[in-house]
Amino acid sequence: MSIATVQAVIDGQTYPLTLSDDGYYTLKGTAPALSSANEPGGYYGVQIIATDNAGNETTIDQDDSTWGAQLCLQAYESTKPTVTITYPSNDGRINTCTPAITAQLRDNDSGIDPATLDLRINNGSKITQGAPGLILTQVEGGYDLSYAVPDALPEGSTTISIGVSDRDGNAADPVSITCTIAVTAPTISLSSPAEGLVTNQAAVQIAGITSDDQLTSVTLTVTVNGHDQGPVTVDGQTGAFALTANPEHMQEGSNTIKVKVVDATGLEAEITRTVTLDTNPPRIVEVIGVTDRVHVGAPFTIRIKVED
């Protein structure tokens, strides 16, 4: 009897082998489109089926004790995984010294190898899978990373870098961001008006100074009895500001003036002044004067009753 067919089954596909002049049946195939990294054992098992003309069949595969090691097809891919740091943002400002760093680790073929994770803060020690505060959540296409920084970072510039490889050893391009940590709130002081000021002028002058490590990014708002006084310009060098209250927003009697400053990280400071507007002149309601003649050099008395 002679051999009728020799076939190979790889990843569910059947391929015929061709008899060569040297007596070997040969398959010159193309590896599967995806990496074998996620297959059991990390390879595609190859099943060989030999059939003779009488219909007798012999089958061996990767589990064969003699030839199994020759029937393990390892396929690898060469596309780099990607890393995206989602928080903090590059050039951003945050108001906590213990931020929760988040990132997306993605690879659409062999898959992210979490054991290769390399997270560093300010070029410090390598933070890897299993570190306290580090959570890797498996999602479609990779992992979502979350890292709760356990020890307070200093205020100022902070650099965060993340690297990772896939299961075929392809390393992602290095990714890093630089952000600014600012946890000290801005300050504000008023030189005008004085607390408790009593005035007959509705156009009250409001002036003061605010301080912050990034004055050009602060937002300052002024309200009079809850009415916004419009945009306020802050000197980017000195922090000084000045404006005049809208007279229409001042009321007779007690008035509340609030000045609030908010920096780029959302930290804020506020100061309040109470000003009394009194535009009503006093009323003279009674005069008890001198009705008799008074000798020169002699004392006299005039009594006035005044209301306000």
Task: Locate predicted features.
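Surface-exposed, short loops/turns at beta-strand junctions within beta-sandwich domains
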Residues: P32-Y43, V149-S157, N246-S254
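Short, solvent-exposed loop/linker segments at the N-terminal edge
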Residues: D91-C97, E195-A202, D292-A298
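Flexible, low-complexity linkers/stalks enriched in Thr/Pro that connect modular domains
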Residues: D52, S65-T84, I177-S189, R273-P282
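Aromatic sugar-binding surface patches on proteins
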Residues: D21-A33, T137-Y147, G236-T244
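Extracellular acidic loop/turn motifs
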Residues: M1-I3, D107-P114, S211-V218, D308
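Extracellular and select intracellular beta-sandwich modules with Ser/Thr-enriched
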Residues: E57-Q70, A171-I177, L267-T272
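Short, surface-exposed loop motifs enriched in S/T, G, D/E and P with embedded aromatic residues
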Residues: T14-D21, T128-L136, Q229-G236
